[in-house]
């Protein structure tokens, strides 16, 4: 377990706040305070990582602890306690999942099949304004013996924007960095997803701000499948178009990463072991070191003594710095990924492979007796590792998701009790589609949705100078439910008038 060096401890209580198993005891005294690490400690290392004063030290290990292997941290779990994740408990000397397996999933509300697709789309429907007027087209047909109605309108939405997903590891800036169109801020870099960079464009505040017209135009052009050039921090140039690979600073992306560096080791540890003595996988999120990784241990490897040029997180997993280098890191060349070697463990002649998470950048090095490294030609086995990574990567693509909120006055064109259509959408009694495409409706109040623009009818979006974007909105439900919410029954037309 760990202990606290009283001379170094400043009683800041950061370790107390962050310990996931509440193993750090704090008591305020008349003269100072007591901070102690109790026998609940699982050696997860959080206290060491948050202590700015180096006051956390290793102590003698407790008896009857079990090392957990369910994640890279490898908690030392005392009898009767759980590890840092609180999932596994030491019960009588055996680690047991602290919750029974749940077999039955929660029941979900699902719309009936006969209302999942609109009878007609709203593309080209027009808008009846003000919104107290019935929607431009209210159309019915009989499906499976049930009368169904679709209400359509092209709704101006000031609450609208885009979520852009770029399948790339290439550095495009930090979260929150401004995104420009023709010198005007139209969005920002968002929190990234696994294997993809994310950008947010628009939103109500940007649409009503000084750059609202540029923002509306950008949303619509991207949503309609046009190519648009954006800049992050007025430096990094992005050429984006839905359904094709992003172009970043003039370089077209080809494939997206197979996973982070740790995941790549986990997937190919056996192949790496058979090919080389060590493999470093470069990634901006987690750099993998095969021999030290638990996946390397699982195939019979022990730490090679090779030290990667990154900050250690846990066994075989290291954090690299963000930058314009390989895999979105600050490493410009494969050689930069090797910091050095512990020659008390490493042996001259060792072959060290460095590869990125798409398998497109790779090199092989040989360790010399003086601790230096010489690059050598790739062996067939080492090249096989890189090709295996490449073969398991997906094509890089730009995805454009349109987001909007239709919970305002546009509901007046649907019915005379607007809250009823909102409730019906959430109860799956009415299905919202956008240009014929299924939409994800956010939980909670209102009708806030997200839709994949590649599934929407082509060129379906426009904008008005209020400014706001205009989206084709369809609501489909049974005629009985429509009447119950105060629908405009006298405006219903049979589908035969349209087809």
From Swiss-Prot:
**Could you tell me which species this protein originates from?**
Eubacterium barkeri
The entry lists its GO molecular-function terms as: 2 iron, 2 sulfur cluster binding; 4 iron, 4 sulfur cluster binding; 6-hydroxynicotinate reductase activity; metal ion binding
UniProt keywords (A-Z) are: 2Fe-2S, 4Fe-4S, Iron, Iron-sulfur, Metal-binding, Oxidoreductase, Repeat
The signal peptide here is none
What does it catalyze?
Answer: 1,4,5,6-tetrahydro-6-oxonicotinate + oxidized 2[4Fe-4S]-[ferredoxin] = 6-hydroxynicotinate + reduced 2[4Fe-4S]-[ferredoxin] + 2 H(+)
Bound how, and how many: what does the cofactor note say?
A: Binds 1 flavin covalently per subunit.
The name under which this protein is listed is: 6-hydroxynicotinate reductase
Q: Provide the binding site for [4Fe-4S] cluster 2.
A: 19, 41, 44, 47
Q: Which Pfam families match?
A: Fer4_10 (PF13237)
Kindly give the PROSITE patterns that the UniProt entry links to this protein.
Answer: 4FE4S_FER_1, 4FE4S_FER_2
Describe the pH dependence: Optimum pH for the reduction of 6-hydroxynicotinate is 6.5. Activity declines rapidly below pH 5.6.
Q: How does this polypeptide assemble, per the annotation?
A: Homotetramer.
Q: In which pathway does it act?
A: Cofactor degradation; nicotinate degradation; propanoate and pyruvate from 6-hydroxynicotinate: step 1/8
What biological-process terms (Gene Ontology) are attached?
nicotinate catabolic process
Q: In the UniProt record, does the keyword Lyase occur?
A: no
Looking at its record, which EC class is this enzyme? oxidoreductase
What InterPro entries does the annotation carry?
Answer: 4Fe4S_Fe-S-bd, 4Fe4S_Fe_S_CS
Q: Where is the 4Fe-4S ferredoxin-type domain?
A: 1-29, 31-61
The Enzyme Commission number assigned here is 1.3.7.1
Q: Which cofactor does it need?
A: an oxidized flavin; [2Fe-2S] cluster; [4Fe-4S] cluster
What's this protein's function?
Catalyzes the reversible reduction of 6-hydroxynicotinate to 6-oxo-1,4,5,6-tetrahydronicotinate.
Residues reported in the UniProt entry to bind [4Fe-4S] cluster 1: 9, 12, 15, 51
């Amino acid at each position: 377990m760990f202990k606290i060096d009283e001379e170094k401890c400043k009683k800041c209580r950061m370790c107390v706040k962050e310990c996931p198993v509440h193993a750090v005891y704090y008591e305020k005294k008349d003269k100072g305070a007591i901070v102690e690490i109790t026998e609940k400690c699982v050696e997860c290392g959080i206290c060491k990582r948050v202590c700015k004063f180096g006051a956390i030290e290793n102590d003698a290990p407790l008896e009857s602890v079990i090392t957990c292997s369910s994640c890279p941290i490898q908690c030392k779990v005392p009898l009767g306690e759980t590890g840092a994740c609180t999932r596994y408990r030491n019960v009588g000397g055996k680690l047991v999942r602290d919750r029974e397996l749940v077999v039955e999933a929660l029941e979900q509300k699902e719309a009936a099949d006969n209302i999942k697709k609109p009878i007609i789309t709203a593309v080209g429907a027009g808008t009846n304004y003000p919104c107290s007027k019935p929607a431009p087209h209210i159309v019915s047909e009989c499906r499976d013996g049930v009368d169904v109605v679709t209400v359509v309108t092209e709704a101006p939405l000031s609450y609208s924007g885009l979520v852009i997903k770029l399948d790339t590891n290439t550095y495009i800036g930090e979260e929150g960095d401004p995104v420009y169109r023709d010198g005007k801020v139209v969005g920002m870099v968002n929190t990234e997803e696994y294997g993809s960079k994310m950008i947010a464009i628009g939103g109500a505040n940007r649409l009503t701000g000084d750059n609202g017209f540029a923002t509306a135009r950008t949303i619509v052009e991207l949503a309609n499948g046009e190519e648009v050039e954006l800049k992050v921090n007025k430096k990094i140039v992005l050429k984006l178009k839905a359904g094709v690979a992003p172009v970043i600073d003039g370089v077209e992306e080809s494939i997206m990463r197979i996973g982070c560096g740790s995941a790549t080791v986990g997937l190919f540890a056996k192949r790496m072991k058979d090919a080389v003595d060590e493999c470093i996988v470069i990634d901006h999120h987690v750099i993998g070191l095969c021999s030290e990784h638990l996946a390397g241990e699982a195939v019979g490897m022990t730490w090679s003594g090779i030290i990667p040029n990154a900050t250690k997180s846990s066994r075989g997993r290291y954090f690299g710095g963000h930058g314009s280098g390989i895999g979105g890191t600050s490493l410009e060349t494969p050689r930069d990924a090797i910091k050095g070697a512990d020659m008390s463990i490493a042996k001259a002649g060792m072959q060290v492979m460095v590869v990125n998470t798409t398998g497109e950048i790779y090199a092989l090095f040989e360790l010399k007796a003086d601790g230096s490294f010489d690059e050598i030609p790739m062996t067939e086995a080492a090249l096989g590792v890189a090709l295996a990574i490449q073969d398991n990567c997906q094509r890089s693509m730009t995805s454009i998701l349109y987001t909007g909120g239709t919970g305002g006055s546009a509901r007046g064109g649907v019915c005379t009790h607007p809250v009823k259509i909102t409730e019906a959408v959430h109860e799956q009694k009415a299905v919202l589609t956008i240009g014929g495409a299924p939409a994800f409706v956010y939980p909670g109040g209102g009708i806030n949705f997200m839709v994949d623009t590649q599934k929407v009818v082509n060129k379906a979006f426009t904008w008005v100078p209020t400014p706001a974007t205009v989206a084709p909105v369809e609501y489909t439900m049974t005629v009985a439910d429509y009447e119950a919410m105060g629908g405009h029954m006298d405006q219903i037309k049979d589908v035969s008038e349209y087809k």
